[in-house]
């Protein structure tokens, strides 16, 4: 298993993963359908630069992901990360994917 940051080179594998996740567990997804073109567009949009998706990969396929955002408080300079999404395909759960 290896990890990659979501980018334009692996976005198609990411979309395939989302489709599979939607098929297997539609109630776990936060959308009704996968906006493929929207995903591709957001990867090039500077607004989303502070959002990062790390993909867990096996055999050139995405099996899990974590999305997080860095932000800080102006008042005290406190820096933090907010994890907004963690999802691992059911057949890869309980194998340490999310811990890595």
Regions found by a protein language model. Name each.
Residues 2, 22-42:
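Conserved GNAT-fold acetyl-CoA-binding loop/helix
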Residues 2-16:
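A short beta-loop-alpha structural element at the N-terminal edge
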Residues 8, 48-49, 59-61:
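Short strand-connecting beta-turns/loops that link adjacent beta-strands
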Residues 13-20, 38-41, 100:
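Alpha-helical elements of Rossmann-like donor-binding domains used by nucleotide-donor carbohydrate transfer enzymes
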Residues 43-55:
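A short helix-loop-beta-strand connector motif used in the catalytic cores of GNAT acetyltransferases and
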Residues 53-55, 61-70, 82, 87:
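Conserved beta-strand in the GNAT
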Residues 71-83, 93:
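A conserved beta-turn-beta hairpin within the catalytic core of GNAT-like acetyltransferases
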Residues 85-88, 94-100:
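Conserved acetyl-CoA-binding loop-helix of GNAT-fold acetyltransferases
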């Amino acid at each position: 298993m290896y990890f990659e940051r979501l980018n334009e080179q692996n976005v198609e594998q990411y979309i395939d993963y989302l489709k599979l996740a939607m098929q297997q567990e539609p109630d776990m997804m936060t959308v009704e359908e996968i906006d493929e073109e929207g995903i591709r567009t957001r990867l090039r949009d500077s607004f989303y630069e502070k959002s990062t998706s790390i993909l867990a990969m096996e055999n050139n396929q995405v099996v899990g992901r974590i999305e997080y955002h860095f932000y800080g408080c102006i008042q005290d300079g406190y820096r933090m990360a907010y994890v907004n999404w963690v999802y691992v395909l059911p057949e890869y759960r309980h194998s340490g994917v999310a811990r890595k």
